[in-house]
Amino acid sequence: MKVAFFGSPAVALPALNSLIQAGHEIKLVITQPDRPAGRGKKLTPPPVKVFARDHGLPCLQPEKIRRDEQVLEALKQAEPEVNVVVAYGQIIPASII
């Protein structure tokens, strides 16, 4: 099954990994933008982005998903059969659901 995955923190990783292990085709990963973290406020990618990069999955990081035409276009091109959302952190508009 073609899947678009929305998630950001480490808690979302088991679900994404399970989808891959079950043989589903991850067409697109959408996660939060990199944010400052730690004492030095170093720009840090969300765990889902790191996982996507390590597995060669296409990944987008919109600041505001409601206002990002690139996300809508990428979803149209990816043609997912289902969207899976696990701890994404933004309200997903009806135009995407």
Language-model regions: role of each:
Residues 1-97:
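One-carbon transfer enzymes
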